[in-house]
C-alpha cells in the first residue's frame, strides 16, 4: 500500500496567468485533491505577506487583552454570533472535551435592518469590536481589508472547483454572489502533555460550509485524517500559504465524491498557536443538491436538497449545544464534590 501523503502545495498563480496548459494542470491537481481528501495548500495567491503579518498582529493584540475585556463582546445568538468565543465553549468532536481554544468571530458589518439580519441568516450582523484596544480603528481597517482579500481569493478557488467538474468558471456564481463568510481569529494555548485526546485544540470534525482558507503560524498542529489507513497526517506550515479544504456543501453537491475530510488541531509544540481561518459559506439561500454530473446510474442521492443556511446552521448549533451540555455536567460534578 502506498504511504499516504500530506496535502500537496500547489502554485495558484497560474490561475491568473495566460498559460492554458499550466492552468489545466492546476485544475487536474485540484481535482485529484478533491477526490482524495479535499485538502491542498496554495501559494502564488494575491494576498500580500504584509497584510498577512498585520492580520496576525491584530489577532495577537486581541488575545492579549484581559479576559474581562474580551468577555464584554462575548458571542451569543442575540449578538448575531459575532464577537468573542470563550475558551472551551465549542465542542467539534462528539464525546470529547470542548475545544482548547478561544476565538473572535468577524465578518462584514451589516446593519441590523439588512435582509440577512432580519431573516437571521447565520453569522450575519454588525461586528462586536473590542473597545479595550488602543488602536481599535487600525484593528478594524486591517481586519476588514483582510476579509475582502480572502473573500476574493475564495471566489477564485470556487471558480477552479467549477473547472474541476468540467463546468465554466462562472458556474457557481449564484453560490458566490450574495455570499456570506466568517473570519475567525483563533488562539490555542499549549496542549497539556499526555492529554492529546481528552482535550484537543480543535476536535476531529468536518467543516460545514463551502470551503475554508486557513492561514496558520509556524507552530503547526493541524492534522487531516487519511480515511483508508486511519492515519492522521500533519499539515506542515508553509510561510504565506493557504490551506484549502472542502467542506460539507461541496461534498453534498458531489454526492460524496468530493471529500470533506475529518481534521483536528493538536498543539503539541509547547507554544501558543495562532491561526486565521476564513469560512466561505456561500449565498445562504443557494440550494445545494446533487449535481447531475455526480449522479451515477443506480447510485442513490445521499442528501435531500437544502439551502446553504440550513446545512450550516444545523451543524454549528450542534457544536455549541454539545459544549454547553459538557460544561454544565462538569459544573454539576464539581458542585457535588
UniProtKB/Swiss-Prot annotation:
Cited InterPro entries: DIOX_N (IPR026992), IPNS-like_FE2OG_OXY (IPR044861), IPNS-like_sf (IPR027443), Iron_ascorbate_oxido_reductase (IPR050231), Oxoglu/Fe-dep_dioxygenase_dom (IPR005123)
Effect of disrupting the coding gene: Results in increased endocrocin production.
Metal-binding found in the keyword field: yes
Domain Fe2OG dioxygenase: residue ranges: 179-282
Pathways per UniProt: Secondary metabolite biosynthesis
Keyword presence, Cytoplasm: no
Annotated SUPFAM superfamilies: Clavaminate synthase-like
Residues that, per the record, bind 2-oxoglutarate: 273
Keywords in alphabetical order: Dioxygenase, Iron, Metal-binding, Oxidoreductase
EC number(s) on file: 1.14.11.-
Tissue expression as described in the entry: Endocrocin is specifically produced in conidia.
Family that this chain belongs to: Belongs to the iron/ascorbate-dependent oxidoreductase family.
Job description of the protein: 2-oxoglutarate-Fe(II) type oxidoreductase; part of the gene cluster that mediates the biosynthesis of endocrocin, a simple anthraquinone interesting for many biotechnological applications. The pathway begins with the synthesis of atrochrysone thioester by the polyketide synthase (PKS) encA. The atrochrysone carboxyl ACP thioesterase encB then breaks the thioester bond and releases the atrochrysone carboxylic acid from encA. The atrochrysone carboxylic acid is then converted to endocrocin anthrone which is further oxidized into endocrocin by encC.
Protein name, per record: 2-oxoglutarate-Fe(II) type oxidoreductase
This protein's encoding gene: encD
